[in-house]
């Protein structure tokens, strides 16, 4: 299993603060029952980072209002 590092995610979201916001927002969504966009059996925080590193989600999710 490949390990996800912050450097992998920083290639997609260069600002560390935006990266943290996007990862925590997505992890919260996953823990509330949203479907993951990548195949994983990890906890929501790791899954969120995997999605960011894969380019499945990005900072555009911070601009959306949950509905």
Swiss-Prot record:
A biological-process GO annotation: DNA-templated transcription
Superkingdom assignment: Bacteria
Gene3D superfamilies, alphabetized: 3.90.940.10
SUPFAM superfamilies according to UniProt: RPB6/omega subunit-like
A GO cellular component entry from the record: DNA-directed RNA polymerase complex
Entries under Pfam families matching the protein: RNA_pol_Rpb6
PANTHER family in the cross-refs: DNA-DIRECTED RNA POLYMERASE SUBUNIT OMEGA
Subunit structure, interactors included: The RNAP catalytic core consists of 2 alpha, 1 beta, 1 beta' and 1 omega subunit. When a sigma factor is associated with the core the holoenzyme is formed, which can initiate transcription.
Name assigned to this protein: DNA-directed RNA polymerase subunit omega
């Amino acid at each position: 299993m490949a390990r996800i590092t912050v450097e992998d995610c920083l290639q997609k979201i260069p600002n560390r603060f935006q990266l943290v916001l996007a990862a925590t927002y997505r992890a919260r969504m996953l823990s509330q029952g949203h479907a993951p966009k990548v195949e994983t059996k990890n906890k929501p925080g790791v899954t969120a980072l995997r999605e960011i590193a894969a380019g499945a989600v990005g900072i555009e999710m911070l601009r959306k209002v949950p509905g």
